[in-house]
């Protein structure tokens, strides 16, 4: 499990340097160490509106993000504070405090727009902080929302049906939370009490009228409702009436703060801790700290090069890095587990291959967990190839350990025989039979040696081969035997040697068969796990489409109630297209199976070792694999 990050205070994540947004290497290093999923809360708003105070509260500290006490904006760029999530185990809460919008000292007014867009792209909960009330002026100050269609793209290429790219924003935008500070109104509408959320809902209702001023005023309202999947509101009383204390509110004791403000702050923090979502990308891909760091770099590279930050492009860059790391992680897992579970030499090759199958299954699962968007299975092919080579290395280590052990045991068992040969003990009448008995005793004792491993017969055969010339010499010098008896003995020795050779050949053929069957099982496992992953990805895709549809239907109903026919018709067209997309995806013949077979074929043949890459053999194995997939209970290769 990833260790928790304990930062004593925030660090700068991005800053504007000479007209370029630059990422801080220290912040990237911190993010790269976070392998847990992250909940990212970003706060944006006009300078000197108390954004930093709320973020410090979320961090559980009075101080951290600089509050400042003058009309000058204190926070520059985007600052980051990573803390263990207080209510989601094994998650990290990342707080992003942003440079105050509208600071007149800024040389580049576009900087505000990019900070706003980055906060949207990086967060799972986007907090907009303002003062007073949500009125016409407050909505005008939120004009940055209307610029998002120019600053963010979902797809790298325009859609062929000419549908606005922004129609997909809701599938990856964060939840929108409006915090209203120093709120002095009563929460009432037409004389009836209303909730904070109802207050925001009413403020975001479109205004009737055709003139450009009204239409411009409606833009932020319309796009907050369209782009952000959920809207939430919190209002806060003034924290303290004493102006001097207010200037240093971070140093004021809790019991000196307004009781309503304390309760409102607690409610806000509680909501964030329990409802702020884990950061995800399209199709439910979880974002870790490491992935967030890569996203920051990718988005800033796009901005600084004059391009528009694009989610699809960012995910492609992320996939390349993460999938490569997933291959390494899976391969390391395989090596570690094999090293822990295998004791060399194994009694049989099958024993080693059985452990290999278990470790390989786990390694593939590791790869599937950490990889995404491996469309052509490029990285899965690399994993297959890597594990095939590692398996061959373990097979070789097993053979070497067996050979070394067996040779040592035979040397020990044959010491007396060697000494007797040197002393000429067997070069006497009847010496051949004495020699045969001594050799047989060595073979019998060798048979009783435990865990000799896969090279046991081969090493024995090599030993027996080394005795052929000696035995022939002893036989010929044995005067107790007639010429006929010597001929029969020589023939018997050759027959036994031939039988041993045949037995050794059969063992090698059996081991080749076991290796082939292990490869077949290996690729069945790859295909089975790939199939499950593709099905999960398809489910996530369908879930995403249905969530988009549900959100758009909700907005459509509201527009119908409010009587905005033009916007209603435009959104209705979007909804109809989305329904068609969902219907097409649901009715689509599950082509997953055929895709898997195609992929399996290319992976399987590409990873076959040496001579097995011959076309006939490769096609035979592929055919066997496909048949087995279609007939899971039937044994194909025999």
Swiss-Prot record:
UniProt-annotated location(s): Cytoplasmic vesicle membrane
Protein name (record): Guanylate-binding protein 7
Subunit structure as annotated in this protein's UniProt entry: Monomer and dimer. Interacts with CYBA, CYBA-CYBB complex and ATG4B. Interacts (via GB1/RHD3-type G domain) with NCF2 and NCF2-NCF4 complex.
Start and end residues of each stretch annotated as Interaction with the CYBA-CYBB complex: 311-638
Native source species: Homo sapiens
Cross-referenced InterPro entries: G_GB1_RHD3_dom (IPR030386), GBP_C (IPR037684), Guanylate-bd/ATL_C (IPR003191), Guanylate-bd_C_sf (IPR036543), Guanylate-bd_N (IPR015894), P-loop_NTPase (IPR027417)
Pfam families documented for this protein: GBP, GBP_C
Broad class of the protein's primary localization: membrane
Occurrences of domain GB1/RHD3-type G (ranges): 35-277
Domain of life: Eukaryota
Biological process annotations from GO: cellular response to type II interferon; cytolysis in another organism; defense response to bacterium; defense response to Gram-positive bacterium; defense response to protozoan; defense response to virus; negative regulation of cytokine production; negative regulation of receptor signaling pathway via JAK-STAT
Task performed by this protein: Interferon (IFN)-inducible GTPase that plays important roles in innate immunity against a diverse range of bacterial, viral and protozoan pathogens. Hydrolyzes GTP to GMP in two consecutive cleavage reactions and predominantly uses GTP and not GDP or GMP as the substrate. Following infection, recruited to the pathogen-containing vacuoles or vacuole-escaped bacteria and acts as a positive regulator of inflammasome assembly by promoting the release of inflammasome ligands from bacteria. Acts by promoting lysis of pathogen-containing vacuoles, releasing pathogens into the cytosol.
Family: Belongs to the TRAFAC class dynamin-like GTPase superfamily. GB1/RHD3 GTPase family. GB1 subfamily.
Region listing for C-terminal tail, in residue ranges: 590-638
GO cellular component, one term: cytoplasmic vesicle
Region of interest called GTPase domain (Globular), as start-end residue ranges on this chain: 1-310
Catalytic reactions on record: GTP + H2O = GDP + phosphate + H(+); GDP + H2O = GMP + phosphate + H(+)
EC number(s) stated in the UniProt entry for this protein: 3.6.1.-, 3.6.5.-
Positions that bind GTP: 45-52, 67-69, 97-101
């Amino acid at each position: 499990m990833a260790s928790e990050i304990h930062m004593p205070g925030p660090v700068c994540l991005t800053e504007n340097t000479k007209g370029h947004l630059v990422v801080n290497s220290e912040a990237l290093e911190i993010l790269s160490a976070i392998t847990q999923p992250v909940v990212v809360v970003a706060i944006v708003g006009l300078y000197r509106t108390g954004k930093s105070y709320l973020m410090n509260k979320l961090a559980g500290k009075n101080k951290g993000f600089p509050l400042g006490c003058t009309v000058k904006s204190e926070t520059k760029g985007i600052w980051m504070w990573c803390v263990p999530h207080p209510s989601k185990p094994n998650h990290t809460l990342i707080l992003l405090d942003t440079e105050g919008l509208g600071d007149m000292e800024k040389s580049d007014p576009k900087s505000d727009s990019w900070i706003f867009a980055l906060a949207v792209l990086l967060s799972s909960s986007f907090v907009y902080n303002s003062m007073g009330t949500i009125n016409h002026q407050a909505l005008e100050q939120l004009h940055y929302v209307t610029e998002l269609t120019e600053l963010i793209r979902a797809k790298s290429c325009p859609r062929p049906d000419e549908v606005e790219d922004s129609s997909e924003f809701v599938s990856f935008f964060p939840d929108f939370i409006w915090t209203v500070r120093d709120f002095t109104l009563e929460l009432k509408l037409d004389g009836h009490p209303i909730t904070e959320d109802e207050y925001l809902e009413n403020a975001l209702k479109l205004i009737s009228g055709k003139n450009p001023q009204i239409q411009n005023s409606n833009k932020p309202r319309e796009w907050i409702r369209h782009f952000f999947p959920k809207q939430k509101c919190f209002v806060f009383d003034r924290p303290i009436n004493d102006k001097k204390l207010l200037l240093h509110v971070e140093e004021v004791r809790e019991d000196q703060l307004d009781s309503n403000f304390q309760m409102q702050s607690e409610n806000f923090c509680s909501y964030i801790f329990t409802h702020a979502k884990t950061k995800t990308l399209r199709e439910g891909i979880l974002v870790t700290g490491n992935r967030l760091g890569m996203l920051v770099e990718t988005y800033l590279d796009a901005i600084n090069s004059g391009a528009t930050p694009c989610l699809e492009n960012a995910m492609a860059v992320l996939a390349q890095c993460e999938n490569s790391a997933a291959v390494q992680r899976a391969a390391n897992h395989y090596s570690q587990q094999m090293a822990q579970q295998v004791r060399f030499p194994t009694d049989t090759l099958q024993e080693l291959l059985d452990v290999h199958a278990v470790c390989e299954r786990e390694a593939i699962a590791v790869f599937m967990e950490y990889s995404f968007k491996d469309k052509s299975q490029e990285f899965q092919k690399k994993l297959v190839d890597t594990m095939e080579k590692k398996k061959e290395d373990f097979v070789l280590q097993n053979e070497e350990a067996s050979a070394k052990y067996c040779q040592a045991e035979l040397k020990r068992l044959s010491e007396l025989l060697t000494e007797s040969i040197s002393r000429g003990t067997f070069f006497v009448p009847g010496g051949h039979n004495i020699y045969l008995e001594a050799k047989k005793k060595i073979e019998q004792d060798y048979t009783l040696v435990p865990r000799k491993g896969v090279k046991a017969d081969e090493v024995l055969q090599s030993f027996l081969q080394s005795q052929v010339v000696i035995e022939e010499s002893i036989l010929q010098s044995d005067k107790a035997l007639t010429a006929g008896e010597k001929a029969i003995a020589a023939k018997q020795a050759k027959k036994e040697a031939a039988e041993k050779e045949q037995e050794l050949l059969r063992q090698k053929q059996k081991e080749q068969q076991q290796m082939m069957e292990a490869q077949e099982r290996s690729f069945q496992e790859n295909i089975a796990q790939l199939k499950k992953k593709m099905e999960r990805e398809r489910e996530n895709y369908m879930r995403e489409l249905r969530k988009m549809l549900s959100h758009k239907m909700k907005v459509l109903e509201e527009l119908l109630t409010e009587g905005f026919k033009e916007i209603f018709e435009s959104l209705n067209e979007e909804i109809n297209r989305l329904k068609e997309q969902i219907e097409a995806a649901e009715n689509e013949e599950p082509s997953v199976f055929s895709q898997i077979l195609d992929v399996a074929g290319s992976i399987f043949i590409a990873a076959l070792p040496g001579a097995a890459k011959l076309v006939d053999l490769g096609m035979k194995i592929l055919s066997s694999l496909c048949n087995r997939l279609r007939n899971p209970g039937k044994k194909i290769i025999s």
